[in-house]
Amino acid sequence: SVGFKAGVKEYKLTYYTPEYKTKDTDILAAFRVTPQPGVPPEEAGAAVAAESSTGTWTTVWTDGLTSLDRYKGRCYRIERVVGEKDQYIAYVAYPLDLFEEGSVTNMFTSIVGNVFGFKALRALRLEDLRIPPAYVKTFQGPPHGIQVERDKLNKYGRPLLGCTIKPKLGLSAKNYGRAVYECLRGGLDFTKDDENVNSQPFMRWRDRFLFCAEALFKAQAETGEIKGHYLNATAGTCEEMIKRAVFARELGVPIVMHDYLTGGFTANTTLAHYCRDNGLLLHIHRAMHAVIDRQKNHGIHFRVLAKALRMSGGDHIHSGTVVGKLEGERDITLGFVDLLRDDFVEQDRSRGIYFTQDWVSLPGVLPVASGGIHVWHMPALTEIFGDDSVLQFGGGTLGHPWGNAPGAVANRVALEACVKARNEGRDLAQEGNEVIREACKWSPELAAACEVWKEIVFNFAAVDILDNK
């Protein structure tokens, strides 16, 4: 007779272990689980632990050839979500041996691979991950980080200013370069390729890189400030992407860009390593994130994607604005902004942070606020994001009635006025509009911008909200 009992057994017998004490080296995950009717939460939580680690649907004889106790994921706690019917937070601990060192790709393949198609669950969302220091240390992380970036750019004590060049598609390379030059000479620190600008028939990448480099060196010479343009190196293959990054380095520009979710984590980590080795900053766009993170009960929360990016590598990442046209509730946004910038972040459920995270000196990432923001938002943005951030005004620069350069001037004046007021001890949350109005008196460009955008509001409730306490 065979030495094991065939047949199907309940997951919870093996994978639900409420008495388990988590180890410092475990990767911990918090899943929001919605079981199918009739499936008990312990079975659902155990099923998640099993399917994302060593389990399969039946007992197999090869189980006897290894030590499941050493390698299995364990569901060690389950809590009911207040105010939601049939939703639970299942906490799962994974032994570190299950993951390849330095590979975000492998980590996600395990933790959020097959398990999301699992029939016993109606829906499943990964809310947070605790990455243990032992695993963090196998990653290079951001190519440079916040302090090195400030030193490279020689810009201190204020947020950085950016602008996405619009119309995003259709401009020729020369006209695109003109738009870049006007924005940079007006006072912005950066301009940006839109995420879907790669290498299209109307503007091939090499032409764009050349004209943008010319624009930024010209603006640099005129203003005496270091300028940058995020040259989007995203391409159809890793080799092509690196070829574009090499060309950017040869031109002597300071920064390139990547769409990390559509490009993929393997490509992103490859580019991040190249950028560190060659002194390029790396701006990260999160195109496609809402496909993954927008549903409250299914998918992956953006704070997990943000943590993954810090491990994979990037110096800037888009993180919502709290005040503009794109998703972002204040407490939640600030929660993952801290996870991007700080070295040590305490568990804080009021901000959606399920685990204490120690980054053990991995460089930080600058959050980028972008999307539907304009000069009237400047006090709120300065207040919410603080100095270590990039504020990006696309339409809020190029939509200025007098053109790009005056639009850039308006934004720079508004920013400098807000920073000055804050440093003098004024409360931007209360006096913000007053600060902007005062600045209008000596900046006609700002006054014109304030007139254009005084009525614009994007009034929609955020989809991503915290559970009732």
Swiss-Prot record:
Its cofactor is Mg(2+). The record marks 325 as: Transition state stabilizer. It comes from the Eukaryota. Substrate binds at residues 114, 164, 168, 286, 318, 370. It is found in: Plastid, Chloroplast. GO terms for molecular function: magnesium ion binding; monooxygenase activity; ribulose-bisphosphate carboxylase activity. The keyword Lyase applies. Its EC number is 4.1.1.39. One of its GO terms (biological process) is reductive pentose-phosphate cycle. RuBisCO catalyzes two reactions: the carboxylation of D-ribulose 1,5-bisphosphate, the primary event in carbon dioxide fixation, as well as the oxidative fragmentation of the pentose substrate in the photorespiration process. Both reactions occur simultaneously and in competition at the same active site. This is Ribulose bisphosphate carboxylase large chain. It comes from Nicandra physalodes (Apple-of-Peru).
